[in-house]
């Protein structure tokens, strides 16, 4: 029986671990909502599911591209279609899970025409103030470099107000209705998980992975400026020591978790405490099977 649901949460919330456990039990397919896991060479920094599990489960949205290739919403839409077709053909559940909830929102809201990012050297601050002046409806945060450059790209290419252009060019949503569950943690407990995960990543070889990436690819690539890798670049360049490296990754991961929590408020969803989430989701799935 095919049906789909989404399992979202902040970084280090345990959503992937939970999705994997459910997929094993119910023979479900999984679509990853993660903008880093799409890259074959980024494993530790993306906290990617181990290869054995990827081989055993029907996984989509992982190991699609090389680091120097560009991933965008249109490619993610194609991966979703592939995952859904596979799950329907095999009478499976499709679990959509990950931390890049922007992709999930796009699936549910529809995709606008694929405009190129601006190549302008304007700073985030400069783009943000331009946006506030001519397009206050855009509502993009000052630290969201990708969306600000995308906004500026639309403005440069059309010479029109970007939020209006996006409304005019929007395509139909791929998902009309979806049950969404968010894994919740108390802030102090999530903080401990972030600290533990950071230490584990460093012990597993994060610095070595970063060195390999920076030795072989342009450090300006968007994927290489993600949390965990950009701090390692400063460490490898001897700008910071090991203690500072760990501290910065923890701080930046905590800040990311806060942004994710804020973004996830946009969804109509059910919040689940991690400790009881597995049993609650299991009951939800069994109820769906019973009709």
From Swiss-Prot:
UniProt entry keywords in alphabetical sequence: ATP-binding, Magnesium, Nucleotide-binding, Transferase, tRNA processing
Reactions listed under catalytic activity: adenosine(37) in tRNA + dimethylallyl diphosphate = N(6)-dimethylallyladenosine(37) in tRNA + diphosphate
> Which cysteines does the record link by disulfide bonds?
none
Residue(s) at site: Interaction with substrate tRNA? 100
The Gene Ontology biological process annotation of the record reads:
tRNA modification
What's a Gene Ontology MF term here? tRNA dimethylallyltransferase activity
**Residues reported to bind ATP:** 9-16
On whether Metal-binding is a keyword of this UniProt record, the answer is no
Which Enzyme Commission number(s) are on file for it? Answer: 2.5.1.75
> What are the binding positions for substrate in this chain?
11-16
Q: Which Gene3D superfamilies does the UniProt entry name for this protein?
A: 1.10.20.140, P-loop containing nucleotide triphosphate hydrolases (3.40.50.300)
**UniProt region (Interaction with substrate tRNA), positions on chain:** 34-37
The cofactor named in the record is: Mg(2+)
Which function does this protein serve?
Catalyzes the transfer of a dimethylallyl group onto the adenine at position 37 in tRNAs that read codons beginning with uridine, leading to the formation of N6-(dimethylallyl)adenosine (i(6)A).
Protein family: Belongs to the IPP transferase family.
Its quaternary organisation is: Monomer.
Q: What is this protein called?
A: tRNA dimethylallyltransferase
Gene for this chain: miaA
